[in-house]
């Protein structure tokens, strides 16, 4: 158990630092009001989580899977997990749950982000 926690933590450190560097790099490379850094890490994270999930299907080394998928991708972007879970819902033909997850996540995510902002910036 502790070994798994350590691997998730180490992956999280690497993922979070990677996200920071990519966000800073993109801010200098693409100066605009569009959030390029977030966009890049979210799309790259989705691709990476898809690759890793496919790889670990045939190479089920738990600590490495935890390091890369839960730790790295989890701190690099949570959008990757959201996207992959929706892909699984589509694969299972759970179209109602797919629609519900996307709709509620987007609407409630924006509402709660706004609520949190309003609570701290009156």
Model-flagged regions — what are they?
Residues 1-122:
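Membrane-interface helix-loop junctions in multi-pass transporters/channels
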